[in-house]
């Protein structure tokens, strides 16, 4: 299996130390603790459709697309959808279309690229002049830091930004 994850759509190749396919966030927490204890790098990955080699490396490849691929919540009134990193745009848009919505970034790999990788790359596509890139459709993103703590990244108002700047490093 490590050979399958030694490359992406680029020409780069490096066999990872291991490959992990977490089924839930608890698996991720355990993995982060293990990697930290053993001083191993984690390489998050979804479909591996990028041409630049971002998901290739000698650490532990973490395939977030295999099992974490659900549309978690949709609120048409608030114009919000929450997805896991393994959701494919061509699976998301048919759910949004009856409500008059669209996830605009339409890459040439929209039938296999996954939202997690698209966020990491700020992907766009042939319609980006009209619909923008992923950052134009992203309100917040949630993840884990190397100490296992959960973090949400999103917009800050001026007071929140000042508080972050004044806080501990």
Region annotations inferred by a language model:
Residues 1-37, 49-79, 108, 131:
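N-terminal flexible segment immediately upstream of the FAD-binding catalytic core
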Residues 13, 36-38, 45-47, 113, ...:
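Short, basic and Ser/Thr-rich N-terminal targeting/leader segments
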Residues 22, 44, 64, 85, ...:
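Pocket-edge structural micro-motifs
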Residues 27, 40, 122-125:
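Charged, amphipathic alpha-helical interaction segments
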Residues 40-41, 102:
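Residue-level detector of anion-binding/catalytic polar loops
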Residues 42-44, 51-52, 92:
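Extended, hydrophobic alpha-helical segments in both membrane/secreted and soluble proteins
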Residues 70-74, 80-169:
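FAD-binding subdomain of flavoenzyme oxidoreductases
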């Amino acid at each position: 299996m490590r050979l399958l994850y030694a490359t992406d759509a680029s020409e780069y190749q490096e066999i990872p130390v291991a490959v992990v396919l977490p089924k839930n966030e608890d698996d991720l927490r355990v993995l982060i603790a293990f990697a930290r204890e053993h001083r191993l790098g984690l390489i998050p990955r979804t479909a591996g459709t990028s041409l630049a080699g971002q998901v290739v490396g000698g650490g532990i490849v973490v395939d977030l697309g295999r099992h974490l691929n659900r549309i978690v919540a949709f609120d048409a009134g608030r114009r919000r959808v929450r997805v896991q990193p393994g959701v494919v745009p061509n699976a998301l848009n048919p759910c949004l279309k009856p409500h008059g919505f669209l996830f605009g970034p339409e890459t040439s790999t929209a039938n296999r690229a996954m939202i997690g990788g698209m966020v990491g790359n700020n992907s766009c596509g042939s319609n980006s002049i009209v619909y923008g890139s992923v950052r134009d459709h992203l309100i917040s993103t949630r993840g884990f830091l190397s100490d296992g703590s959960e973090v949400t990244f999103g917009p800050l108002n001026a007071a929140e930004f000042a508080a972050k700047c004044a806080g501990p490093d």
